[in-house]
UniProtKB/Swiss-Prot annotation:
Signal peptide: none annotated. GO terms for molecular function: 4 iron, 4 sulfur cluster binding; metal ion binding; N6-isopentenyladenosine methylthiotransferase activity. This is tRNA-2-methylthio-N(6)-dimethylallyladenosine synthase. Residues 378-441 form the TRAM domain. Binds 2 [4Fe-4S] clusters. One cluster is coordinated with 3 cysteines and an exchangeable S-adenosyl-L-methionine. Pfam families: Radical_SAM, TRAM, UPF0004. Its EC number is 2.8.4.3. Belongs to the methylthiotransferase family. MiaB subfamily. Its main location: cytoplasm. [4Fe-4S] cluster 1 binds at C12, C49, C83. The keyword Chaperone does not apply. Coiled coil: none annotated. The lineage of its organism: Bacteria, Pseudomonadati, Pseudomonadota, Gammaproteobacteria, Alteromonadales. It is an enzyme of class 2 (transferase). It comes from Pseudoalteromonas atlantica (strain T6c / ATCC BAA-1087).
Length: 477
């Protein structure tokens, strides 16, 4: 009988990536197949997030729902992972003693051993240590599910913004070796992946070691990923403005695989609030970076993160944020009302902005973003957009759906052979969360890929011999 695994995931794309790795790992080591519901599972894992308010209580409410499953099936294994597990540790077992496993983001690779310990008679296993990058050495080959895929290139953050728990739950910045990242991308490309999304809590701070010990910057990594055959689009998240350096901006001029979309969290448009948050930059510095980038990519679309009602935020501070939103012309935001995270420096500040004011400001901000997004979408009508076809439309399974470079969902009539490839679409209509279009051409008509025999490539190269008589390969320009 097939053993079943159910994973419930809360939080960021890194958590989604981690959950997929857990599933792949337990499939390869124990043969567990993913279940659709917790009721049919032999193992239940909750991958948690500590960013939102009352994250801990949300975890215990969910565990309470699963308690009866454990009573009905005593051999059921229940595990809690992610950032809340890293924060709470032993407290989870104290409040929910029926939980078998507690593991942090950096120890998910040890799940097979933990499960074996429970099956061997251990009452519980708790491992919330920070073994840095070890987890990537123990994970199986990636499995592609469609033409897009996430690839984690680093873990943790060393910025210590005053509101953020990430350095305490995922540790400080640790970058994966370059060769490991490139191998994972190449393996995904072999399985038909056309777009990769490079992940990290502070992804553009990547400083990955080469096999010879030299350090690779994020801009250099982008160039190498773009050179992998089959990869036609590159996205990345989440970035920090301080690490969004000129070499990354310049990469947009030379790497066409980098999409015309950037998510760059700013949190506030007020220098005073940015200083309280310990963000390390001003609003004008943020604007300057984006203006440089838009000189290279005039059609760039922008999204960002905002915290509303940070301690001490005045009406003037909020207006500065609204001015920044208008100046940068953001068309998407992830905006949250501030709530203190236990253990962070900001938790010691007086939370002096009323809930009513926070909600009013949040509504104003979201309305501004929505208006800008609708205007930008309407300007796309009659334009031609290249769309990566991801599969059937969620709204109408008889249609197909995909994304433009600027991250807009487009629904259109098409044929199954288009899935996994590119189509050029004329945008005909705009809806609240999507666009509609008509297919103009398929990938076969785009000349995206030109197959050239190795002999033809070599024939174009020039070989130069140095003073020692050693031939040096020099690519032709």
């Amino acid at each position: 009988m097939t053993k079943k695994l159910f994973i419930k995931t809360w939080g960021c794309q890194m958590n989604e990536y981690d959950s997929q790795k857990m599933a792949d790992l337990l499939d390869s080591t124990h043969g567990y197949q993913v279940a659709d519901t917790a009721e049919e599972a032999d193992i239940i894992l909750l991958n948690t997030c500590s960013i939102r308010e009352k994250a801990q209580e949300k975890v215990f409410h969910q565990l309470g729902r699963w308690k009866n499953l454990k009573q009905d099936k005593p051999e059921l294994i229940i595990g809690v992972g992610g950032c809340v597990a890293s924060q709470e540790g032993q407290v989870i077992r104290q409040r929910a003693p029926f939980v078998d496993l507690v593991f942090g983001p950096q120890t998910l690779h040890r799940l097979p051993e933990m499960i074996n310990q429970i099956k061997g008679g251990s009452s519980s296993v708790i491992d919330i240590s920070f073994p840095e990058i070890e987890k990537f050495d123990r994970l199986p080959e990636p499995k592609a599910e469609g033409p897009t895929a996430f690839v984690s290139i680093m873990e943790g953050c060393s910025k210590y913004c005053t509101f953020c728990v990430v350095p305490y739950t995922r540790g400080e910045e640790v970058s994966r070796p370059v060769d490991d990242v490139l191998l994972e991308v190449a393996q995904l490309a072999e399985q038909g992946v056309r777009e990769v999304n490079l992940l990290g809590q502070n992804v553009n701070a990547f400083r990955g070691p080469h096999h010879d010990g030299a350090i690779c910057t994020f801009a250099e990594l982008l160039e190498m990923v773009a050179s992998i055959d089959g990869i036609d689009r590159i996205r990345y998240t989440t970035s920090h403005p301080v690490e969004f350096t000129d070499d990354i901006i310049d990469a947009y001029a030379t790497i066409p695989e980098l999409v015309d979309h950037l998510h760059l969290p700013v949190q506030s448009g007020s220098d005073r609030v940015l200083n309280l948050m310990k963000r390390g930059h001003t609003a004008i510095e943020y604007k300057s970076k984006i203006r440089k980038l838009r000189k290279i990519r005039p059609n760039l679309s922008m999204s960002s993160d905002f915290i509303i009602g940070f301690p001490g935020e005045t009406d003037d501070d909020f207006e500065a944020t609204m001015d920044l939103i208008q100046a940068m012309d953001f068309d998407l935001s992830f905006s949250f009302i501030y709530s203190a995270r236990p253990g962070t420096p900001a938790a010691d500040l007086p939370d002096d902005v009323s809930e009513t004011t926070k909600k009013e400001r949040l509504q104003l901000l979201q309305n501004r973003i929505t208006q800008q997004a609708l205007r930008i979408a309407r300007n796309m009508i009659d334009s031609e957009q290249r769309v990566l076809v991801e599969g059937p439309s969620k709204k109408n399974p008889m249609e197909l759906s995909g994304r433009t470079e600027n991250n807009r969902v487009v629904n259109f009539e098409g044929t199954p052979d288009m899935i996994g490839g590119f189509v050029d679409v004329k945008i005909t209509d705009v809806f609240a969360n999507s666009l509609r279009g008509d297919v103009l051409r398929k990938e076969a008509d785009m000349n995206l890929r030109i197959n050239v025999a190795p002999q033809a490539i070599l024939a174009k190269q020039t070989n130069k011999t140095d003073a020692l008589g050693v031939a040096q390969f020099v690519p032709a320009h």
